[in-house]
């Protein structure tokens, strides 16, 4: 595998270059004016399926704004990802309003708003963060089962599975 550094709105790959494309926790960092271009590029280089996951909508943005304020009130430096989250409003489901008819969309809720806020506040404290990571290593199936229970609405993050309805026509 070879790492390629590029801009998401100008991918240096041929049409339908990959069977699947995964874009995880990226769209909220893309300026709103470039998001449609990123989606167009991802669809262009994907042959069969695209999976995008991101914090979705105004309610998710507000949760991160509260978290950001919590860091400030404790005189703690917010993580870089959280600082970046404050730069642009989060995309919502309408990001796919112009989805070509050759693609179908499935939406999977991931992590409730309440759980995300609770968990991120716990991670502010090193003993809790360490304990959770230890638990994840020792009993991963138990943790996974628990985490599945919090994948529902109102969701902080949504996962969009876009599937091409038929084989692409190669130009």
List PLM regions with ranges.
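Hydrophobic beta-strand segment of the Class I
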Residues: 21-22
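Short, well-ordered alpha-helix to beta-strand connector turns
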Residues: 1, 18, 46-47
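Conserved SAM-binding strand-loop segment of SAM-dependent methyltransferases
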Residues: 1-12
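Short gly/ser/thr-rich secondary-structure transition/capping motifs
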Residues: 2-3, 30-32
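Histidine-centered divalent metal-coordination motifs
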Residues: 25, 29
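S-adenosyl-L-methionine-dependent methyltransferase catalytic module, highlighting the catalytic core
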Residues: 32-171
């Amino acid at each position: 595998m070879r790492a390629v550094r590029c801009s998401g709105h100008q991918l240096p790959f041929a049409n339908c270059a990959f069977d699947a494309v995964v874009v995880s926790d990226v769209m909220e960092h893309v300026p709103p004016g470039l998001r449609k271009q990123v989606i167009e590029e991802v669809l262009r280089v994907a042959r069969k399926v695209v999976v995008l996951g991101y914090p979705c909508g105004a309610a998710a943005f507000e949760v991160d704004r509260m978290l950001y304020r919590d860091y400030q009130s404790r005189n703690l430096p917010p993580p870089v990802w959280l600082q970046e989250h404050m730069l642009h409003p989060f995309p919502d489901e309408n990001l796919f309003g112009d989805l070509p008819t050759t693609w179908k969309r499935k939406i999977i809720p991931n992590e409730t708003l309440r759980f995300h806020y609770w968990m991120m506040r716990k991670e502010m404290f090193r003993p809790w963060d360490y304990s959770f990571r230890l638990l994840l290593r020792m009993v991963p199936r138990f943790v996974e089962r628990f985490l599945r229970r919090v994948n529902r609405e109102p969701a902080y993050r949504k996962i969009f599975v876009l599937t091409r309805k038929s084989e692409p026509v190669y130009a």
